[in-house]
Amino acid sequence: MSFGNTTETDILNLIMLGTALPWAAATELDIHLHTASPGEGGASTVNEATYTGYAVVTVNRSSTDWTVTGNQAVNDNLIQFVVCSGGSNVITHASITPEGSTQIIAYSALGSPLTVESGVQVQFGAGTLTLTLD
């Protein structure tokens, strides 16, 4: 996953200036789906999925939802979106934002595009959503 530009600036301000992350107090994260890259300078609303029934999934920022080992964070639980009830999208990217915000913390292309149409439920199994710092 790549960091969004605003998040990169936030992290540099934290490291170099001691400025707290604006979203440091957020206890939850939102997972978004996209039909194309939202881009490093983009917001989570850029190219966001539009199929009927789509809604972001909110997960906790906690050790019960994520395992951090070395330079990687991995989801510990199933992340499951609502079943598509109409329309269709080809999902190519996912992003993570602070809950209720459009600021992209990180985003990435999926391993392969996923066609979502009526009856399809997008999900990330435990251990399949990985954020790596390098």
Where are these regions (language model features)?
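Small cysteine-rich, disulfide-bonded extracellular modules of the LU/uPAR three-finger superfamily
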Residues: M1-A94, P98-D134
